[in-house]
A protein has these predicted regions:
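N-terminal interaction/assembly modules
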Residues: 1-134, 190-213
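Short, locally clustered residues in the helix-turn-helix/winged-helix DNA-binding domain
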Residues: 151-152, 186
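Alpha-helical hairpin
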Residues: 138-139
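Helix-turn-helix DNA-binding module
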Residues: 153-173
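DNA major-groove recognition helices of helix-turn-helix
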Residues: 174-192
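The N-cap/first-turn positions of alpha helices
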Residues: 142-143
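A short pre-motif secondary-structure segment
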Residues: 146-147
C-alpha cells in the first residue's frame, strides 16, 4: 500500500472529502459573484453615504445636548447604570445622570459607532474593488459594457441588444457574456481567498450570501 492510498484512507476515516470541499468552495464563489454583481449598484450608493458620514466625523456630545435630549423624553432614565427611579423631579433625574457620566458614555458610544461605520466602509470598498478589479483584469471592454448594462443600469436583454448595431448582438450572446462576467468575479474571489488578509472579509461575504438564501 503506497502513501497516497494510506492518506486517502485516513481522509475517509476522518470523514474528509477533499472533492466535496472543493465543490462546495466553487459553489460559494459562484453564489458570491452573483451576489456582488446584483448588489453592485446599491454598494456604490452606500459607499457615498458611508464616506459622507466618515468625513463628517464624530460630533462631540455636550452637556447641553444631554439636557435637551433627556428633557425631551419622559421615560427611560432608569435604563442607565444609575438609580433614578426613586427621583420624581425630572431636573434632579437629569442631574443624577449627568453626575454619573452620561455625557462621557454617549461620547464613547458615538466613537464606537463611528469605528463600526469605518469597518463597514472598508468591507464595502473591498467588495466594490473585487467587482471592479475583475472587470478591469478579467473582462473585455465589451464584456464590461454588457456587465454594467445588466447589473448597474438594470437594462433588459432587449434594451441591451437595441444599444448595439442591429443584428450584432442577440439574447444568447448576452446570456453567455453574463456567465463569463460572473465567472470572472468568481475567479477573482477564488484568488483572493488564498490571502489570509482577506479571510475576515470572506467570512463576512459567506454570511451575507447565506442570509440571501
Amino acid at each position: 500500500m503506497n502513501d497516497k492510498t494510506v492518506n486517502a484512507g485516513q481522509n475517509q476515516e476522518a470523514g474528509q472529502n477533499p472533492k466535496a470541499e472543493q465543490d462546495s468552495g466553487e459553489v460559494f464563489f459562484q453564489e458570491a459573484a452573483l451576489f456582488l454583481a446584483e448588489t453592485y449598484g446599491r454598494m456604490l450608493d452606500d459607499r457615498v453615504q458611508l464616506k459622507a458620514l466618515i468625513d463628517a466625523g464624530v460630533i462631540p456630545y455636550t452637556e447641553e445636548m444631554a439636557i435637551r435630549d433627556l428633557s425631551a423624553v419622559s421615560v427611560g432614565y432608569n435604563t442607565e447604570r444609575v438609580q433614578t427611579s426613586n427621583i420624581s423631579n425630572i431636573p434632579e433625574r437629569i442631574a443624577a445622570l449627568l453626575d454619573s457620566g452620561y455625557v462621557e458614555k454617549m461620547n464613547r458610544r458615538l466613537k464606537q459607532e463611528m469605528a463600526e461605520t469605518a469597518r463597514d466602509y472598508a468591507y464595502l470598498c473591498w467588495k466594490i474593488e473585487t467587482v471592479e478589479t475583475a472587470m478591469r483584469e478579467r473582462m473585455s471592454k465589451k464584456e464590461q459594457d454588457i456587465f454594467e448594462r445588466i447589473f448597474l443600469r438594470k437594462r433588459t436583454y432587449r434594451q441591451i441588444c437595441a444599444a448595439y448595431k442591429k443584428g450584432t448582438l442577440h439574447n444568447k450572446q448576452i446570456s453567455q457574456t453574463k456567465k463569463k462576467c460572473l465567472q470572472a468575479i468568481a475567479d477573482h474571489l477564488k484568488n483572493a481567498s488564498c490571502f489570509p488578509m482577506y479571510s475576515r472579509y470572506m467570512d463576512n461575504l459567506r454570511r451575507e450570501c447565506q442570509q440571501e438564501k
